[in-house]
């Protein structure tokens, strides 16, 4: 899953889900089906097949991290700042991350790095390696 085509599907300010927008795809909820072809722009309010309204919008970085599928424990946004300060990490850093895990920290590091910076991330788990590749990170 990458941020490029990911949206939040929200009902009643309670039920939030991440979904990947693809033509001719549907998002199935307990309140009906949402057809992605019906979404013309973002943000948008769309009606499910059972006449329930959903808000569809591009997620904030924090929403993406908190709603993304997890394998291992994620590093929460509130902890990322402490890691950046302790590691003296800035946009010009070259980073070697040992233990990609869910990719939450990797994703944030990728977001802040300058184009000339490099981010190397290693994980012994093939599943975590595939998860990082799906995030479409540009510095890896």
Please state what every model-predicted region is.
Residues 138-140:
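Conserved small/polar residues in nucleotide/adenosyl-binding loops
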Residues 132-133:
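Conserved SAM-binding loop
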Residues 67-80:
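Conserved SAM-binding loop and adjacent beta-strand
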Residues 1-55:
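N-terminal auxiliary segments of SAM/dcSAM-dependent transferases
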Residues 77-91:
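Conserved alpha-helix/loop element of class I SAM-dependent methyltransferases that forms part
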Residues 92-101:
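Conserved class I S-adenosyl-L-methionine
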Residues 118-123:
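Conserved SAM-binding motif I beta-strand of class I
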Residues 102-114:
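Conserved SAM-binding loop of SAM-dependent methyltransferases across substrates and taxa
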């Amino acid at each position: 899953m990458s941020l490029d085509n990911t949206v939040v599907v929200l009902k009643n300010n309670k039920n939030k889900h991440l979904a990947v927008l693809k033509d001719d795809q549907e998002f199935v909820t307990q309140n009906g089906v949402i057809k992605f072809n019906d979404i013309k722009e973002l943000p948008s309010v769309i009606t499910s097949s059972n006449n329930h309204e959903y808000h569809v919008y591009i997620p904030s970085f924090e929403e993406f991290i908190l709603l993304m599928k997890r394998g291992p424990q994620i590093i929460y946004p509130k902890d990322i700042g402490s890691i950046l300060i302790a590691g003296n990490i800035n946009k010009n850093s070259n980073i070697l991350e040992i233990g990609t895990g869910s990719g939450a920290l990797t994703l944030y590091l990728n977001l802040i790095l300058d184009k000339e910076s490099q981010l190397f991330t290693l994980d012994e788990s093939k599943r975590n390696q595939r998860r990082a590749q799906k995030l479409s990170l540009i510095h890896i």
